[in-house]
UniProtKB/Swiss-Prot annotation:
Record's subcellular location: Nucleus
GO molecular function: single-stranded DNA binding
Region (Leucine-zipper): 593-614
Amino acid composition bias (Polar residues), ranges on this chain: 135-153
Keywords for this protein: DNA-directed RNA polymerase, Nucleus, Transcription, Zinc
Domain of life per record: Eukaryota
Any one of the GO BP annotations: DNA-templated transcription
Protein name: DNA-directed RNA polymerase III subunit rpc3
Similarity comment text for this entry: Belongs to the RNA polymerase beta chain family.
Subunit structure: Component of the RNA polymerase III (Pol III) complex consisting of 17 subunits.
Family matches, as InterPro entries: POLR3C_WHD, RNA_pol_III_RPC82-rel_HTH, RNA_pol_III_Rpc82_C, RPC3, WH-like_DNA-bd_sf
Example of a GO cellular component annotation carried by this entry: RNA polymerase III complex
Species, as recorded: Botryotinia fuckeliana (strain B05.10)
Keyword check for Transcription: yes
Lineage, highest ranks first: Eukaryota, Fungi, Dikarya, Ascomycota, Pezizomycotina
Length: 666
């Protein structure tokens, strides 16, 4: 995350809102001043040593500040990525609840509040929060509460949920190296290798490359040095949930009893976790889950619900081998071949892992062969294949995207068309828009259980859905082999690039209208162009295009380059080329997004200050849950008003966070 002015302001507001003014003051100084020792930090913050230690304790516990001891001095450095991750706490809890139920959400919530904590402390806090209160809200009889009260969770259930969260990567054990910044770790490893193996300095390019490779290897070992959380004799459970709405609903409904998904929460000593094990939230892995959810929403909107369920399960299988969205260039090895899939899922593996509650025969258009036009699809696939072959010939390697003739079987989407394609206008503002009525009747909403079908037929239906995903314009999937009825992979960089391009087009369309959208698409495809050529290609009057281009330049969406025809550099002998630098536009939009999020937080703080008395009254323990009985009608109206404003502002922050994820993190 960049340390721009608005990004620093946003992270400072987040820390201040959750952890108070003292922690926010220290964190802001570290963000603006950089890495500082205790004496310099004391001088800039004008705080006492005791106040600094209290604030740093909170920040270090939340991993908001790195620390590294060099001799007698300890240097502190702000972790801006962990500060921004506070925005996504609600999304992380929501995903955990969808996957594993309310117990997992409460465990994750405790880790959000505590930062890192021992398992015994987490269990104690959960049981403490679920103790019955003698305030009239619950009646305790023989050590149990009634249906309106609260209850404590069995230790076996909490242990099983913790194991599930550890298996999927939502949480991770805390290692000693996690408290040191990546820069300090790199410098320490480099210094040790230089002194031990190279006499203090390297000589020549060969030794520099060798040193770089050895540093990368040791950094990978340091990152993998985390405490082993698996008990002796532990076996991975086979009760992992499926990422679909049906399984999630069944899982949540079953939490009222003593078992979940048929699992008996007994005190199994062979799989009991160590109570002294320290855990924290793995934000890098949680970002992978948020990216998967965004891609599933994209597949749902472009193709259909059933296909999105299958795509979600495929992404879940791939996520088991993806520790983070963006690799660290100083630690992770670079991929030489961009088309070389590192993670492959076969149709057979996906079918076996798919939940039986999903009727895979629905969501696929059923039309006669006479009504299916596959010419456009064949043309697109042949074009992709030729492009891949040309790139492979240039690089001197064979293309990995070759497919057999059996792969070009006719398949359609729900509207009876082979795929969404542009019309004759190459710069249409709404490509692939089809407003005609559906020609096929679906049974997606049929609540009857799916009919029994053979395994081969189910695999064929799954393969049809995968072919729909592969044929989509967003390239949601790519076929890379024919083993076990097809091998599939996801080129995340390409998919996110298309998603980023779509979001950018939407923003430009909303702010500059149809003409601005067409002009940007022309410049994106053709590159730098003169004004008259842009107007000609976009089929727009030159006067209209000039007005829109100037307006977009004032807002930073496009830029202009002056190219003189001769050395005289006269204005009449100068060519003005318009272009759209998407990297610059993305950086500009990110900065404006951070500014909008910080303004939302500031507005929320102002609204809460205005209604501070009502909020304090509603937060009393004897009033919570019974506001209507204790508050007057005018007080209830004020409370509803402030809660509605809070919901609107926080919802806007979450929507803006989606843009940050698309443009930067995914």
């Amino acid at each position: 995350m960049s340390k721009s002015k608005h990004a620093v302001e946003l992270c400072s507001l987040l820390v201040d809102d959750i952890y108070g003014e003292l922690s926010s003051r220290i964190f802001t100084i570290l963000l603006r001043r950089g890495r500082l020792p205790m004496n310099a930090l004391k001088r800039h913050t004008q705080l006492t040593t005791r106040q600094l230690k209290l604030g740093l304790t909170v920040l270090v516990r939340q991993n908001l500040v790195y620390h590294n001891s060099e001799g007698s001095d300890t240097h502190y450095e702000a972790n801006i990525d962990a500060a921004y991750a506070l925005v996504r706490s609600g999304k992380i809890l929501e995903i955990a609840e969808e996957r594993f139920g309310s117990v997992a959400a409460e465990i994750m919530g405790q880790l959000v509040l505590l930062g890192h904590a021992k398992i015994s402390d987490i269990i104690a806090e959960l049981n403490k929060n679920h103790e019955p209160h003698a305030n009239g809200n619950s009646n305790e009889t023989n050590g149990a509460t009634n249906g309106n009260g609260v209850h404590s969770y069995p230790s076996g259930q909490l242990n099983h949920t913790l194991i599930q969260l550890l298996e999927e990567g939502f949480i991770q054990p805390v290692g000693q190296n996690m408290f040191r910044s990546p820069t300090d770790s790199y410098n320490a490893v480099e210094k040790a290798l230089l002194q031990d193996s190279y006499g203090g300095a390297t000589r020549g390019t060969k030794q520099k490359d060798e040193l770089r490779m050895r540093i990368r290897g040791q950094l990978q070992e340091l990152r993998a040095q985390v405490p082993n959380w698996k008990p002796v004799g532990y076996n991975r459970s086979s009760t992992n949930g499926h990422t679909n709405d049906i399984a999630s609903k069944r899982r949540r409904l079953s939490h009222s009893g003593g078992a979940t998904n048929g699992y008996d929460f007994g005190d199994d000593e062979s799989s009991k976790l160590d109570g002294n094990l320290v855990l924290r939230i793995n934000h890098e892995k949680c970002t992978v889950f948020m990216r998967n959810r965004r891609l599933v929403e994209l597949a749902n909107s472009r193709i259909g619900v059933t296909t999105s369920y299958i795509y979600a399960e495929l992404l879940r299988l791939m996520a088991e081998q993806i520790p983070r969205c963006r690799p660290d260039p100083r630690i992770d090895d670079a991929v030489d071949d961009a088309d070389g899939p590192s993670i492959i899922i076969t149709t057979q593996e996906l079918t076996d892992a798919l939940s039986k509650t999903i009727n895979v025969s629905t969501g696929i258009g059923k039309a006669t062969s006479q009504k299916i036009d596959t010419s456009r699809l064949d043309k697109l696939q042949n074009g992709r294949k030729r492009k891949a072959q040309d790139e492979a010939e240039v690089e001197g390697v064979a293309s990995s995207d070759e497919e057999s003739e059996d792969d070009h079987k006719p398949f359609t989407n729900g509207n009876g068309h082979a795929m969404d394609v542009d019309e004759d206008d190459p710069f249409s503002d709404q490509p692939g828009a089809n407003t005609s009525k559906r020609a096929v009747t679906f049974k997606d909403r049929d609540r009857t259980p799916p009919p029994t079908e053979s395994r081969q037929a189910r695999m064929m239906h799954v393969m049809s859905h995968l072919q729909l995903l592969a044929a989509d314009d967003c390239q949601l999937l790519r076929k890379c082999g024919a083993r076990q009825m097809g091998e599939w992979t996801v080129d995340f960089e390409r998919v996110i690039d298309r998603l980023r391009e779509s979001e950018l087009d939407s923003i430009i369309y909303e702010n500059f209208g149809q003409i601005g959208h067409r002009l940007v698409r022309v410049m994106r495809k053709m590159g730098k162009l003169e004004e008259k050529h842009i107007a000609k290609l976009a089929l727009i009057k030159q006067q209209d295009s000039r007005t829109t281009l100037v307006n977009m330049q004032m807002h930073g969406m496009v830029d202009i380059q002056e190219v003189p025809r001769d050395t005289g550099r006269m204005i009449v002998r100068t060519i003005h080329l318009w272009f759209c630098d998407e990297d610059r536009v993305t950086s500009l939009l990110l900065d404006r997004t951070y500014k909008a999020m910080s303004r939302c937080l500031q507005r929320l703080d102002v609204e809460k200050r205005r209604k501070a008395n009502i909020i304090a009254l509603s937060e009393r323990t004897d009033v919570q849950g019974q506001e209507e009985a204790f508050l007057r009608p005018e007080q209830m109206n004020q409370l509803r008003e402030i809660r509605a404003k809070e919901e609107d502002l926080l919802g806007q922050i979450c929507r803006l966070d989606e843009l940050v994820g698309i443009f930067q993190d995914y």
